[in-house]
Amino acid sequence: MDPLGARSCFVDADALPCWADVRDGEGEDVPDGGRKDAPHGGLHSPFPYRNDINKKVILWRGDVALLSCTALVNTSNETLTDKNPVSDSIFRYSGPELSEEMQKLKGCRTGEAKLTKGFNLAARYIIHTVGPKYKTKYRTAAESSLYSCYRNVLQLAKEQGMASVGFCVIATQKRCYPPEDSTHIALRTVRRFLEAHGAALEKVVFAVTEQEEGTYRRLLPLYFPRSLEEEQRSIPFLPQDIGNAEGEPVVPERQIRISEKPGGQDDDSEEEGLVKDLSVIGSHAFARMEGDVDKQRRLALQGQLSGAAMQKQHQRNYNRWLSRARTEDLSDIAALKALYQSGVDNCGRTVMVVVGRNIPVLLIDMEKALLYFIHMMDHVAAKEYVLVYFHTLTGEHNHPDSDFLKNMYDIVDVKYKKNLKALYFVHPTFRSKVSSWFFTTFTVSGLKDKVHQVESLHQLFSAVPPEQIEIPPFVLDYDARENGPFFPSQSSFLSL
């Protein structure tokens, strides 16, 4: 609480000047490549002058964490642990309660929006969202994801009956998104939302830095003209893609084309092109007819689907997962260092290490975790290997549920199960022993004989030489405290 008589650092959104009050042309430059005398007569802007909407929009140079409004927006990564100026400021002013609240959220996917309280902030709520990483090769996907960020934030605000929202710039430079491109999407999406749901929100604040302000001030007139004259002047500078009725980016090749004469024949050139297009249909794995999946499952239950057909169906499913694992950005999962390849065991088999304490189950997308597991393991599982799982100092928030583990076991290729020769469960607890016994006895019985409960690192070293395995420091410290520095008797070693 501020001392009596002290001036608050927070800024009331209602006290800030709205866009309608900023004079036409004040502080703005003509967009790059344009001329003030560009032809525009007779054209109608897709974003016409509307003073009622302009009164709801505010451009403010300042820290979004200091805004006094119903909700403000935090931009982060999929584990909601990103370090950036916006997030750092929000966490600093909100107090320790926000960090505790974030533990309850199971992360946030790119383009989604999730809600928490504002705690010590002047804002009542914080809406967390995850902007996309920009790569020129995947520009369309990045644009769609960024649109989803803004749209989902606004939709959540509408559903919760919020009066005002303070936006930071969601597409940070850390994620390599071109500032001008991201600003077009932000302004366009907000404009379309206010057109359709203007009664739901009283104020939308764009909180920007000094570096970002110039771009916003230059592009705002395109989407929020403050006069009929400014509306006409802005037309030549609008981008070619202005989105659909909701501001969502439009991909022409994905739109369904409808013939002007459905009952008639197209001309020869169109027919020739159609024949050419049809010639490639079915030439790739994902375009083949698969039949009714539910029917196949019923037949399998009735014993009418052959083992070979089931195996083929399983292989196709795994190949789809593998294709995704090779193309999706899994850098957030890789950064956890929860799964990595080490050396070889006494039999020359590859050693893969899983660090349980590095798996924040509640904060990550477990589907992406499965994709990363497949990405790392596909080439390793082609030959014999062993898994070393460090259960050391794990908590409830580090334990995937049995349904996830069963699903993973069912999805992976048969080579994973065939070539896994041992799973060393290091530093088990009584509870983990009971859980693993039930899981390997009743859920995945084929794994039971391969699981070894390992009480100490000295016991593990009888199977995997210490120089062949990278062990996290906290595991070494724990083992030294619990088991001492000396090797136990040879009789306690693992028998292979």
From Swiss-Prot:
Membrane-spanning ranges: none
Ranges of residues in domain CRAL-TRIO: 329-483
Protein name: Ganglioside-induced differentiation-associated protein 2
Coiled coil (UniProt feature): none
Signal sequence coordinates: none
Family, per entry: Belongs to the GDAP2 family.
Superkingdom of origin: Eukaryota
Region (Disordered): 22-45, 252-271
Domain Macro, residue spans: 44-224
Biased composition (Basic and acidic residues): 254-264
Source organism of this protein record: Xenopus tropicalis (Western clawed frog)
InterPro entries listed in its UniProt record: CRAL-TRIO_dom (IPR001251), CRAL-TRIO_dom_sf (IPR036865), Macro_dom (IPR002589), Macro_dom-like (IPR043472), Macro_GDAP2 (IPR035793)
